[in-house]
């Protein structure tokens, strides 16, 4: 029972000590790093087996001692320990224990001293000295335990949960307390000394176990402190690791961002390069299209220029050919004019000087132009020049004044010839149409009379003033004019009609002038006889109607020729003798009066004679 009570008290004491250590650990928050277990010098490993065997022996001896020993023996033994015969043994033993305790504190726990029996040298001399020594040792032991409890601070309450089980010990013996052994009387002194020795041995074991427990607790506390320090270090390392991990994550993230940025920059650079290349290709395609369009346009223009050049070359060739043809034609005309002049000169020698007296100036001018042309052409042939190198222009320049003079003279001569030709027609002397025999004779001699030109106006005036000659018997002798005179007058009218195209007169104006001119002879012949007037009027009407009809036909043909001039030169290259082709009157173009007259006149009429005279003139120019 007492052992149980003591065990409970020891547990309560241990719990109070644990609470004190908790409070002290909570108040002391500073970190301390105790020495590692490897730094404890002369550390002795104690097996739990030996401890258990020692505890078992102690308990067996303790219970046996309680049964066999008496209280008197214990009291006598304690008295001997207090008294001591000499008093030196207790001091020496106390010094030995103190030195042993110091050695335990300095060198660690030595269980071999407690597990083997002590030598006989260390046994106490007397019981009093032993008692005093035990009391001092207990006091020092408790003080050392208290100091160790205050010095060693456990980290956690689990520090007391050691695997080593320490046996409970009784309450420490103090010097004030006396060992009271009651019950049995003391026995033999030798036995008491042996009991004291055994008790001292037990106490030494208990103290050694307590010191071992304290050292184990300190070791456990050191280990737990080391564990705590390790935990702190681990936490710090974990914190460092976490910081390093965060830094590594940030570095990885930064690297990823930089990689993404570099990739984006590369993509942008590639896209910009592709865009620039695409733009360059677009510009190149536009330029190529434009160049192709320009090439097509230039090719088209070149083809047009080539075609125009070929046309110009063809035109030049045609112009050169036409110039050559015109030159040849002009040469032929000049030769014809010269031969015509020679023939006219031969005709002048046949008593026709009076008929050609008024027409010598114009013929001389034409002859002069023809001779000048032939001379220039001959000079060009001698020099070996071409007609396209400007020599022809020089000929035209040289003959320009003479040609203009000739044309002006012709323009001035046409109205005068026209008036003289109209006045030269003896309309009043015509009394009746000629007979058939006379017509045949006149038609036979018309070839020679067709070349007669108009006579001076004075001769025609004399004839008109004296149309009727009186015979000796007083009768009027009417001299009918021959058809040759009518032929000459009609040829003069035709020449005037042909030359009137240069002045661009209309047919209506010409008809009005003819009517006015027809009125003048009528007014001048009002004093004639009525019968003569009727005959003359009928003849004049027939002649005027024929002239007007012929003029109308000529004007229509000239309009057709002028319209044909608008066509290309290749289509209007007419024959050089076209002007001398006879123009016959179509029946549908004649009026009713002309048709009636035509039916009443035979083939040997004036129209037939005019046609024959035109043919003879053509033969003359060709021959």
Curated annotation (Swiss-Prot):
Residues 417-485, 497-536 are annotated as: Disordered. Residues 422-431 have a biased composition (Polar residues). It comes from the Eukaryota. Keywords: Coiled coil. This is Uncharacterized protein At5g41620. The keyword Methyltransferase does not apply. GO terms for cellular component: chloroplast. Residues 452-481 have a biased composition (Basic and acidic residues). Residues 256-351 form a coiled coil.
